[in-house]
Design a protein with these regions (language model features):
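Short glycine-rich anion-binding loops that position phosphate/pyrophosphate groups of nucleotides
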Residues: 24-26, 94-97, 121-123, 241-242, ...
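Short glycine/serine/threonine-rich phosphate/pyrophosphate-binding segments
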Residues: 28-34, 97-101
C-alpha cells in the first residue's frame, strides 16, 4: 500500500482545508485514528479539523485534542460549514456514509471535497475518491500508523500521535487478545512505545476510571438482565431506558458489556440490546466458528466484522429481542 499512502500524503500537502470524519457512536478506534491523523496533519502545517457525528464518551475525553472535535449533535451548522469548505475529507473507520447518522450523512455526501476512506470493515460503499480498505488489519488506527510509516517516516511520530494510535489499537483488539492481532500489530506497538507512549496510563484512563454508577449499572446488567438462550451457546443482555435512568447512565457506561456476556463459560455468541429514544442499539460479539456480521447486516440494519458487529432496530425492545431469539437457530446452531 506504500504508493497509495504516498498519494494520500501528497493530497494532504496540497490541501487548504482538511476535515476528518468518523462514525456515529465513537469508540476508541474512531477517536484514536481521528486524533492520530489530526496531530500528524498539524505537524505538516495544514489546516485540519475533526468533525464527528456525536460527542466522545467520558472515558475517551482525556485524549489530547478530544476537546477540539466538533460534534454534529451539538453544532450541525458548524459541521456543515466545515464540510462545505473542505477540499479534502477523510472518512475513517466506516465503510458507508450512513454510518455517520441519517442527518450528517447528507452533508457528507453533498460535500464537494475529495474524499478518502481509510477503514478495516468489509464491503466498502462507493462514495470516496481514494479507498484504503484492509479487513485483515486489526484497526483503522494501525492503518493510520502504516500511512505515516510507509509514506513519510516514523520520525514524524510523537507521543500525541502515538498515544492516539495506541488507544485505537488497544481498544479495537480487546487489549491485544482478538484474532485480528498479528506480529505486525506488536511491531507497531513497539514503535509507539519508543515514541514515548505511556501504555499503562492509556489503559488506566480507559479501563480503570469508573464511576460508582457505571459499575453498579454493569453489575445489575449481568446479575439481573443476563439471559442464556436454551439449547444454544448464545446469551444476551438488555437494558431499558428505565434501567439506564436508574443508574444515571452516561455515554460509554455500557462499553464492552457485550464482551462480558461473551466471556462466560460456554457462550460463543452474545448480543447486547440498549433502549434509546426512538431506537434500540445492538452490539454483537462472537468467537470460534460463530459469526455475527451477516446477522447484523441482514436483519438489524448494521454490519461489521465476523466476530464484532452492530445494528439497530426501531421496533420495541421486547419485539427486537424476540426477533433475535427466533434467528438464533439459523445462525448459531
Amino acid at each position: 500500500m506504500t504508493n497509495i499512502f504516498k498519494q494520500i500524503v501528497s493530497e494532504i500537502l496540497v490541501a487548504d482545508h482538511i476535515v476528518i470524519t468518523s462514525h456515529k457512536g465513537p469508540d476508541g478506534d474512531s477517536i484514536g485514528c481521528s486524533l492520530g491523523l489530526y496531530h500528524f496533519i498539524k505537524k505538516l502545517n495544514r489546516r485540519v479539523v475533526v468533525c464527528h457525528p456525536d460527542v466522545a464518551p467520558d472515558f475517551l475525553r482525556w485524549m489530547e485534542g478530544a476537546d477540539d472535535i466538533i460534534a454534529f449533535e451539538n453544532d450541525p451548522e458548524k459541521v456543515k460549514s466545515e464540510l462545505d469548505s473542505a477540499d479534502l475529507i477523510f472518512c475513517l473507520d466506516y465503510n458507508s456514509p450512513d454510518r455517520t447518522g441519517k442527518d450528517m450523512q447528507d452533508f457528507l455526501v453533498s460535500a464537494q471535497g475529495k474524499k478518502i476512506m481509510i477503514d478495516h470493515h468489509p464491503f466498502p460503499a462507493d462514495f470516496c475518491d481514494i479507498v484504503v480498505s484492509d479487513t485483515a488489519c486489526c484497526s483503522t488506527s494501525q492503518l493510520i500508523f502504516e500511512l505515516i510509516d510507509q509514506s513519510v517516516n516514523v520520525e514524524k511520530l510523537d507521543d500525541r500521535i502515538g498515544t492516539s494510535l495506541y488507544l485505537g489499537i488497544m481498544t479495537d483488539t480487546g487489549s491485544f487478545r482478538f484474532p485480528s492481532v498479528t506480529a505486525r500489530t506488536h511491531e507497531v506497538i513497539a514503535t509507539l512505545l519508543k515514541a514515548g507512549v505511556r501504555h499503562s496510563d492509556v489503559h488506566e484512563n480507559v479501563y480503570d476510571s469508573n464511576t460508582l454508577d457505571r459499575l453498579q449499572l454493569r453489575g445489575y446488567a449481568v446479575a439481573e438482565k443476563f439471559e442464556k438462550i436454551p439449547g444454544f451457546p448464545v446469551a444476551l443482555i438488555s437494558l431499558t431506558k428505565e434501567d439506564l435512568e436508574r443508574f444515571h447512565y452516561k455515554k460509554g457506561d455500557t462499553e464492552g458489556l457485550v464482551n462480558v456476556a461473551l466471556s462466560i463459560d460456554g457462550i460463543n455468541a452474545a448480543a447486547f440490546f440498549m433502549e434509546r429514544e426512538g431506537e434500540i442499539k445492538i452490539s454483537f460479539r462472537s468467537k470460534g466458528d460463530y459469526y455475527v456480521n451477516e446477522l447484523a447486516m441482514q436483519h438489524f440494519s448494521g454490519g461489521g466484522h465476523k466476530y464484532a458487529a452492530g445494528g439497530m432496530s426501531v421496533e420495541p425492545l421486547n419485539v427486537t429481542i424476540d426477533r433475535f431469539k427466533k434467528l438464533v437457530p439459523e445462525y448459531f446452531a
